[in-house]
């Protein structure tokens, strides 16, 4: 691949498809270099707060996108109970398992960096606040408001059943997936009522002031803890359907006074059922305030609302993080958690708009190939290297061949006897003299070249010089990751480690095996030229079978480790937006 010596552009590895400049791909200035913390690759900042920030990221083991909250411990220690509050948030979120609750994946501390990392599932559709900002007149269509509010009811029903009070329900903390599934997030001020000896701490105002109920703004001594969340739900509903807050004020004192008076104005043309629902939720007396059961069964929540206006769209989905080769020892702001770098290996980022790919990111979905079934169509590297084999009647050799056949049958799970072996019975060939399996090291091969089982997939996955999308990242990732026994044997390093520069030819499915042929060395050539023997007792069976590759969802296989040849940080490669045959080295 040709390298631009003086690049005038660097690309961000997060893109948004609504910015169409180059075939649906818009390149934007990269704000920060991607970093690796533990086994998470960090991307751009999604949001910032008083105590830290949230970054886009990817789990390099599962190739699943994540959101990483990064908190500086020095700042937390300046706040009374700061670290304890964060640990409480972690413990509360860990116990919640519901489709409408943000999922906590991991959490850890890196002492030398003085930072706490909390890893959540990635929810890319944006927040209710994002939707409101993009909505005409700042409000949502009635049917969309109803759709969102119904899911919010389910989320609150679940957390209240687990004795959890959120205490900060608002549009900013209501997220959406691109499948329009609501996710309630940010349990930073939440409380587990089952762990409280008394409810005095709940009487203090937390969260956003505009969403606080009168019992907290008036510092009342009696209140219903779970009705705090219900009040915030009412304010959120008012904001979604009318486009403004029900209460406002020039300062905090005026705002709290207006909340206590609870004088609410409604447009004249607003749905009467909706007015009745909001009034029932925003009751000053918490005893008279609607319960979740009353809200769920209210006429406005259960009736059909026609779609007069179109839905306000979610944020556009962005493509993300295709390939990673190595763990790097990050020396940047948010790194330091790697296992060791990849030396001169490259950490490659690119993009792919084609979503019609098979999802192989789950390591359990590894195909198996049956004996006698030919592997997927690949270029024949040695089409002229055909040999005619003679059959020998030596009984001892025949027993060895039968034993070898049993081993191959045990591996492949099929009884086809049209197999060929070399003189040492170490290599297994199909009826077309294609090397299928090396019994010395249990290595899958296609035309004599080692491949990972995941590469045996028959679907023609698109590979290009501009990377891939998240669906097929696991497939292409295997081309640059050594096998499970690399670290112990070092055998595959001989084949792969000497080719660190990745070219467009490497990613071309028609040239991929040709490119790797030189790295295989004379070992495979001599193996292919050795005398082969036919162990088949059914030599007259000339029936050919079509390629058949089966997926076994129940089959479990660990994800191969990433290469870690040294502690140096990997190079970062970004593709040129002007010429896809070029790349830019950072």
Swiss-Prot record:
Keywords: ATP-binding, Kinase, Magnesium, Manganese, Metal-binding, Nucleotide-binding, Serine/threonine-protein kinase, Transferase. Residues 326-418, 484-586 are annotated as: Disordered. It catalyses: L-seryl-[protein] + ATP = O-phospho-L-seryl-[protein] + ADP + H(+); L-threonyl-[protein] + ATP = O-phospho-L-threonyl-[protein] + ADP + H(+). Residues 385-395 have a biased composition (Basic residues). It holds the Pfam family Pkinase. It is an enzyme of class 2 (transferase). Its cofactor is Mg(2+); Mn(2+). ATP binds at residues 46-54, 69. The keyword Ligase does not apply. Residues 396-418, 535-544 have a biased composition (Low complexity). Residues 518-527 have a biased composition (Basic and acidic residues). Signal peptide: none annotated. The active site is at 168 (proton acceptor). Residues 553-565 have a biased composition (Polar residues). Its EC number is 2.7.11.1. One of its GO terms (biological process) is negative regulation of gene expression. Residues 491-504 have a biased composition (Acidic residues). GO terms for molecular function: ATP binding; metal ion binding; protein kinase activator activity; protein kinase activity; protein kinase regulator activity; protein serine kinase activity; protein serine/threonine kinase activity. InterPro entries: Kinase-like_dom_sf, Prot_kinase_dom, Protein_kinase_ATP_BS, Ser/Thr_kinase_AS. Residues 40-301 form the Protein kinase domain. The keyword Coiled coil does not apply. Coiled coil: none annotated. Belongs to the protein kinase superfamily. CAMK Ser/Thr protein kinase family. LKB1 subfamily. Serine/threonine-protein kinase that controls the activity of AMP-activated protein kinase (AMPK) family members, thereby playing a role in various processes such as cell metabolism, cell polarity, apoptosis and DNA damage response. Acts by phosphorylating the T-loop of AMPK family proteins, leading to promote their activity. This is Serine/threonine-protein kinase stk11 homolog.
